[in-house]
């Protein structure tokens, strides 16, 4: 085996080529299809205000000396909130018309803060002692009527609305909840009407919903993979939305190259009205080196990953989201030579075996407006010495800490021109096994280089890209965009004996052509120009900086 390793070293087979299961590039979530719409989906006709009754001891031509005003039934405003209104009526004689103005001012305060179905009135009372009581009637939702659902559970929709309709009813919060419901991929359209209920302050909400088709399928071809395992990949994915009728999501994907078969299944199920999600993820990869001359060594690998986790939104509005999550995952990787002989191509794995048990704490934040989208993601990973995790005294193993941060800014420059900036970084306090390292190079990080051209324990990668429409639906042939870009990335390792091959910093620039024939069919061709030369480029379309991506959505 020592002779084999020597031959591999002389031949210049890098760790990236030798590992058929390389690290996953630090991709950010996909760009939004569109900026959020601002159309109102809630119809609120004029609702009757609470009845105004005359105080029993006061007629329209009388006035009383007011020494105290008590607002009863109020749960929204503090004494400090009401003081500017009440102070102008205290310590003087007040007429009947002024009492009506007082209740109107309190009602207006409710309305200004979104409590449109709330108000105040002056009930019959004895005012001879100078104490005036104003009764607040705070609006409540009496009933929710839902029409149009067949597959989706009424309870799921009611829970989504009920979170924002707790008394007192705030129409701004209710409309935000309806907009979130409209963004649910399982629902196509939402129409809502608020009508008067059976008593003052009570309202009824009538929802008319149209369900979306529950399945989304995608087929695509691209040349994103390392040439060592076959760069051209064909993939198929299927996503199910609310198949169980409770807001659940099920997605699966299968991708195949000449040397790789990779598939995963991802499941998320909300378990309460606060939209807490339980998540499960499973991925399996089988790889084989097919690049000449190393294909003669029958180098292959397998990898399995399984994660269980929970995700909790803390802020959830149509324009802003913040969620935290935690997951426990197991990763098992095996590499072989001569088809079935365990073999390690880098420090850390034991006879080709890498086991990682990791606790991952995630924070995700998104902010949207009509003109821009900001997204950030932070992940703290703690490698645990559990479930047979790889353990070494003086080499990378399964006990480690790493932080991965990702940021994305999309800005509309007008005329459908977009500015897109991305930044991702991984910082590790420990030497990492290959399956946890950070990679740069390829169509999703630094264009102009091979996929995973450089790999390290820590790294930073960023890009700036413009998307400029040059043709809009010429003869019914869709939209064509030009996408000039600049990408920069660098990686480094811990330990002086584990230096990243020079150069460890990659810089690429170039231009792409995006063609969107329709919502179902699109294609992208990108030409990346490396500004920092590397010696290990190989011979492929990727080596020439050319990447393509063709996507078709049949449903």
Regions found by a protein language model. Give the residues of each.
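Transmembrane beta-strand segments that form the barrel wall of outer-membrane beta-barrel proteins
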Residues: 192, 215-225, 236-242, 246-258, ...
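Residues that define the transmembrane beta-barrel architecture of outer-membrane proteins
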Residues: 201, 230-234, 259-263, 302-306, ...
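Repeated loop/turn-to-beta-strand initiation elements of outer-membrane beta-barrel proteins
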Residues: 215-217, 244-250, 273-278, 287-288, ...
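Transmembrane beta-strand segments of outer-membrane beta-barrel domains in Gram-negative
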Residues: 277-432
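Extracellular loop and loop/strand-boundary signature of outer-membrane beta-barrel proteins
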Residues: 223-224, 251-252, 292-297, 339-351, ...
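Membrane-embedded beta-strand positions of outer-membrane beta-barrel proteins
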Residues: 217-219, 238, 250-254, 278-282, ...
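Periplasmic polypeptide-binding modules associated with outer-membrane biogenesis and secretion
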Residues: 19-225, 236-237, 253-264, 403, ...
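C-terminal transmembrane beta-barrel domains of outer membrane proteins
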Residues: 391-555
């Amino acid at each position: 085996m020592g002779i084999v390793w020597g031959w591999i070293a002389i031949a210049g087979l890098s760790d990236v080529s030798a590992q058929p299961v390389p690290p996953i590039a630090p991709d950010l979530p996909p760009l939004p299809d569109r900026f959020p719409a601002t159309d109102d989906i809630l119809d609120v006709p004029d609702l009757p205000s609470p009845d105004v009754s005359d105080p029993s001891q006061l007629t329209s031509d009388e006035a009383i000396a007011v020494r105290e005003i008590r607002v009863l039934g109020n749960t929204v405003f503090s004494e400090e909130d009401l003081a500017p209104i009440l102070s102008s009526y205290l310590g003087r004689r007040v007429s009947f018309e002024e009492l009506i103005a007082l209740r109107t001012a309190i009602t207006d305060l409710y309305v200004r803060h979104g409590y449109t179905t709330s108000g105040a009135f002056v009930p019959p009372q004895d005012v001879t002692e100078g104490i005036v009581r104003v009764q607040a009637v705070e609006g409540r939702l009496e009933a929710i009527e839902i029409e149009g659902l067949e597959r989706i559970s009424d309870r799921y929709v009611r829970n989504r609305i009920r979170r924002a309709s707790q008394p007192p009813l705030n129409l701004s919060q209710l409309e935000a909840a309806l907009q979130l419901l409209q963004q649910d991929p399982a629902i196509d359209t939402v129409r809502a009407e608020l009508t008067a209920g059976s008593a003052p302050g009570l309202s009824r909400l009538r929802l008319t919903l149209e369900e979306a088709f529950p399945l989304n399928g995608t087929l695509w071809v691209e040349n994103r993979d390392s040439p060592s395992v076959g760069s051209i990949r064909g993939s198929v994915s299927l996503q199910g939305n609310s198949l169980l009728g409770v807001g659940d999501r099920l997605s699966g994907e299968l991708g195949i190259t000449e040397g790789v078969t990779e598939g995963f299944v991802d499941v998320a199920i909300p378990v309460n009205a606060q939209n807490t999600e339980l998540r499960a993820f499973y991925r399996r990869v089988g790889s084989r080196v097919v690049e000449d001359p190393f294909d003669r060594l029958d180098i292959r690998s397998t990898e399995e990953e399984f994660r269980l986790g929970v995700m909790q939104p803390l802020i959830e509005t149509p324009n802003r989201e913040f969620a935290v999550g935690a997951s426990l995952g197991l990763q098992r990787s095996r590499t072989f030579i001569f088809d079935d002989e365990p073999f390690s191509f880098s420090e850390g794995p034991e006879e080709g075996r890498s086991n990682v048990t990791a606790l991952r704490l995630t924070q995700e934040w998104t902010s949207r407006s009509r003109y821009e989208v900001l997204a950030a993601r932070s992940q703290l990973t703690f490698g645990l010495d559990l479930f047979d995790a790889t353990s070494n005294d003086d080499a990378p193993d399964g006990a480690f800490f790493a932080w991965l941060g990702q940021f994305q800014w999309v800005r509309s420059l007008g005329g459908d021109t977009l500015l897109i900036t991305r930044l991702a970084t991984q910082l590790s306090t420990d030497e990492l096994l290959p399956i946890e390292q950070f990679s740069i190079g390829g169509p999703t990080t630094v264009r102009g280089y091979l996929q995973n051209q450089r790999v390290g324990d820590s790294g930073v990668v960023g890009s700036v890209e413009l998307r400029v429409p040059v043709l809009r639906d010429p003869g019914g042939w869709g939209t064509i965009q030009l996408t000039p870009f600049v990408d920069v990335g660098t990686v480094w390792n811990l330990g002086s004996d584990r230096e990243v091959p020079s150069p460890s910093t990659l810089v690429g620039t170039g231009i792409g052509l995006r063609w969107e024939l329709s919502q179902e069919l699109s294609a992208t061709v990108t030409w990346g120009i490396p500004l920092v030369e590397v010696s290990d480029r190989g011979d492929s379309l990727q080596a020439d900086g050319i990447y393509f991506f063709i996507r078709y959505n049949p449903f």
